[in-house]
Each structure stands twice: as structure tokens, then as C-alpha cells.
Amino acid sequence: MYHYIEDKVFLKDMKYLCSNIINQLVQLINNDSLMEVKAHLVGSGAKNLITQNSNEPIDLDCNLMIIDSEININNCREIKEYIRKQFNVILNKNGWNDCMDSTSVLTTEKRHFTKGNHTEFSIDLAIVFNDRNGCHRLIHEKTGVTAWDRYYWNSVPDSRNLFDKVAAIKDEHLWDEVIDEYLEKKNMYLRRQDYNHPSFNVYVETVNQVFNKYFD
């Protein structure tokens, strides 16, 4: 079952290392002329939402949000390929291997610290953008034949005004309820063997549930 990471030293070191790599990626892309992006760990604005399933490796979920793009926003294949190549530049520069292109994220190799906590961890980088309808996540649907693969934007349900809802919850000092409910939902989907709810979707679902309970 999922639990929150209690080793604060390990958590701090892992977040520092991975955030540094992601920040380098953001700077590399923003210094180019094709795209403007920003990045954040899923739920990291509120902290304390990094989970681990039993003793398995930790997936550090990060959203790379497109703010502006010279590449047509609907050209999902070109967008993902551009970001994948830039990500590999940064990973290689830091001594990491190339990332893997999965359906909804770019996944790094698993790493671990040589001192202290030896738990393995990796970065799962999702490519997203926001519009008036909410948040959309870039999907690469693989067919087995590269030329036939599909790339498209998948809407995250009920993600409209997410940041405003988070701010309202924090202002009323209700974030502990989000922390409790988020973990409960992660374990609920695990028990159901439902693997169609990425961490960000669970986060959005949790924020909406708490917001609707107190503000709707």
C-alpha cells in the first residue's frame, strides 16, 4: 500500500537533485526560441504529497507546463519529440541515461544515493498545458508501428480553476484533509488494480472533493 515518505533527509535530497535537473531543462527550453515552459512537482506547492508503494522505487511526478509555443500546440508528436531530446541533453549532462518515452510521461532511469537511504527513485515528466477548459496532458498512444502511433491532448477531468481551489483550501487551513484524502484515493485505486489514474489526476480529484465539501 502507498504511504508518505517519512525520511525527511532523503526526501529533501531527492527533491533537490530531481528539481535541479528539471530546472535545467526549463532553462534550456526557455533559452531557445521555440517554447516557453514552467515546471512543478505534482502537489509540490503544498508539499508532503510524495508517496511510495511499500518498498518499491519512488516515481517523482513532475508536470512540464507549456506557456507558449512556436510549435503548433496540436502538433503533439513534434512537441513531445522536441522536449524528449532537450530532456536527454540535460540528463546526459548530469550523468544520467536517456529518458524512456512512455504513454503519458518521459521516465528517467532509476537512481539511488550511495549514502544514507538507498531507495531507488526516478522522474516521471508529464507534458501539459492549460486553457479555459482546464489542464490537458500529452499522450503518446503506441501501436507497435512508430509511423502509426497517435499523439494527442487528453483533458484532465475537472481541472478547471485548480490553482484557485488549492489557494482557497490553503487559506482555510484545510490542507491536512487533502493530504489524508490523497493517500486514501491512491490506495483505493491500487486495491482496485485501477492503473488509469495518474498521480496528477488523483491530486485533481482530491482537491475537487475537499473544495466542494467546504466551498460548493
Feature map (PLM): residue ranges:
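Helical scaffold of the NTase/Pol beta-like nucleotidyltransferase catalytic core
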Residues: 1-41
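Intrinsic-disorder-associated interaction segments
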Residues: 3-18, 72, 76, 196-200, ...
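Conserved catalytic core of two-metal-ion nucleotidyltransferases
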Residues: 28-35, 77-133
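Active-site nucleotide-donor binding segment shared across nucleotidyl transfer reactions
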Residues: 29-60, 64-73
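Right-hand nucleic-acid polymerase module
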Residues: 115-216
